[in-house]
Regions:
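C-terminal functional modules
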Residues: 376-510
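Beta-strand acidic-aromatic groove motif in beta-rich domains, primarily in extracellular
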Residues: 63-72, 149-150, 233-234, 442-447
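Extracellular glycan-recognition regions
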Residues: 24-26, 101, 455
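Structured, solvent-exposed acidic/aromatic patches
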Residues: 79-381, 419-428, 433
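Bimodal feature
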Residues: 1-3, 20, 45, 185-186, ...
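Membrane-proximal, proline-rich intrinsically disordered regions
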Residues: 21-78, 465-510
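Terminal processing/anchoring signals of secreted or surface-associated proteins
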Residues: 12, 21-24, 54, 137, ...
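Bacterial Sec-dependent N-terminal signal peptides
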Residues: 1-30
Length: 510
């Protein structure tokens, strides 16, 4: 692993976290004490710098943040990539070190501190506050979906009080509602756009785009809680669609960094290769997006793309890098965080549940999700793909000299929509295609597997520390909480509703 624990903690604790680190996102050279208070207020420089910091946590592309928050968790557990270092302890095998468990939560204090500074400098009455609410919601949705209960006002202290996952979701919904109301009621959006464009790494100051993103987060949330809060979910989803979600690829939430986090961890460092699960589905479906997603391995065989089974006992990272395909990204490839394709699939599921998603049918939104994905990746052949009612996932054949072994296919679901299929078949077909289209957003891929059980994934090829799950339901809390925050930790486990381990389910899984 390419991150030092000491350096990582230093990175988190340095006061310069709100200044020098932001220089990696935009060309801002903040000379610290040389700036007067008046100069800090000029062009909203002070509040803008904290909003940049918030974006760095909400959409982590810096290599250490990306690896510890995204790669080690969602990308591996969502079966997009798999860890190919020799380390025999990781989340896939249900036995990661405490450092791996603690890392995602360690990014909460910086975004909370930055949010509080935005409020101090700006107040709570305009689109700047709305933007901060949206960024915090994006980050905390990930935190709670990794751990379950989580401190909402985390400041890195020893007295952090945990909130239940349900309460966190309710707070995030309220925050997003407040944010969209503030944006809609603002009469100076053109002026605000010009002011904040230098600090907006996603939409260049276009707050109408942030409004669509906030509504899209609400639709994502609604689908996630649909099994445990069906009435609330329907109301939230219908409101989000009515108010306007992301529907065009030009509105997709993407962010550019000076070096793509996925490129750094997978290509430059070589810590991962593509997972056998997504390769087997896409190979079986003859999916033309494969060449956009993956690269051919150095040691090629009968297949152009070869994945490695999740949890494979890696004997040599050097050999694994040669045998298996890596991701097809460059240093400048933008990170992808929410797309029109995902929203179309959410609408498709909503209609399947009886929600009003704007008048379309499940079939229409399902096909729109696939079309949007093909267009997003600039791939031809979508008409042929949509009509394929015979292709299924293929059996996985490991490469000669590989580490995971062969595995028979675990799904027979086809691509073409069938209104006469059973509800289970419809859900499997819909979520399997959604999972393929969500790539490379591993956190959302993992969320879908946990929430629905789809797509079906391969068993792990080695012992999993006594667990019978195919992928964890959550990540355990930092064990240091048992020492330094014991009373609140005990309460957090009560809120969790089960042991502090990999098996206890999320609130929205029950």
């Amino acid at each position: 692993m390419m991150v030092s624990r000491k350096l990582f903690l230093l990175f988190l604790c340095l006061p310069a976290i709100f200044s020098s680190c932001t220089g990696r996102f935009v060309d801002i050279n903040r000379p610290g004490s040389k700036l007067s208070p008046d100069e800090l207020k000029r062009d909203n420089y002070a509040v803008g710098s904290f909003l940049i910091q918030m974006q760095g946590v909400a959409f982590p592309e810096q290599e250490n943040a990306y690896q510890t928050m995204i790669d080690f968790v969602g990308n591996y557990l969502g079966r997009y990539t798999t860890y190919t270092k020799e380390l025999p302890k990781n989340h896939t095998l249900f036995n990661a070190s405490n450092a791996w468990c603690a890392w995602p939560a360690s990014y909460a204090p910086p975004i909370v501190s930055a949010f509080n500074e935005v409020v101090k400098l700006n107040g709570k009455e305009n689109v700047t506050y709305a933007w901060a609410l949206i960024l915090r919601a994006q980050a905390f949705l990930r935190f709670t979906d990794i751990y379950g209960p989580f401190p909402l006002s985390m400041n890195n202290g020893s007295d952090e009080v945990y909130s239940s996952q349900r309460d966190i979701y309710l707070q995030l919904i309220n925050d997003l509602n407040e944010a969209t109301t503030l944006i809609v009621s603002d009469t100076h959006l053109a002026q605000e756009r010009e002011t904040f464009a230098p600090y907006d790494l996603v939409y260049k100051g276009d707050f109408n785009q942030w409004r669509k993103f906030a509504n899209s987060l609400k639709l994502r949330i609604a689908v996630r809680i649909s099994n445990v809060e069906p009435v609330m979910a329907r109301s939230l989803a219908e409101q989000a669609v009515r108010d306007g979600v992301i529907e065009e690829n030009e509105d997709n939430c993407t962010i550019s960094y000076h070096k793509s986090g996925l490129w750094t961890t997978a290509v430059s460092w070589g810590d991962s290769r593509i997972c056998a699960d997504i390769e087997s589905y896409m190979t079986g479906y003859k999916d033309p997006r494969m060449s956009k997603y993956f690269l051919q391995p150095i040691s090629t065989g009968v297949r152009r793309f070869i994945g490695c089974r999740a949890g494979a006992p890696i004997g040599s990272n050097v050999v694994a890098k040669r045998l298996y395909s890596t991701v097809n990204v460059s240093q400048t490839t933008p990170g992808i965080w929410l797309t029109a394709s995902e929203m179309a699939f959410c609408k498709a599921e909503g209609v399947l549940r009886g929600w009003n998603m704007g008048g379309g049918t499940t079939k229409e939104y399902y096909e729109e999700g696939i079309r949007r994905s093909f267009s997003q990746w600039d791939v031809d052949g979508v008409a042929t793909y949509l009509m394929d009612n015979t292709s299924t996932e293929t059996n996985y054949i490991d490469v000669i000299g590989g580490y995971g072994g062969d595995a028979g296919k675990v799904s027979t679901i086809t691509i073409k929509w069938d209104d006469n299929a059973t509800m289970a078949e419809k859900m499997e077909r819909l979520i399997t295609q959604k999972w393929i289209a969500l790539y490379p957003n591993g956190q959302e891929a993992w969320n879908e597997i946990r929430r629905t059980g789809y797509p079906h994934i391969f068993a792990l090829p080695q012992s999993t520390n006594g667990y019978t799950l195919l992928t964890p339901n959550r990540i355990p809390f930092d064990k240091n909480q048992q020492i330094y925050n014991r009373q609140n930790y005990t309460r957090a486990v009560e809120l969790l509703g089960g042991p502090d381990d990999y098996a206890t389910r999320m609130w929205w899984q029950r």
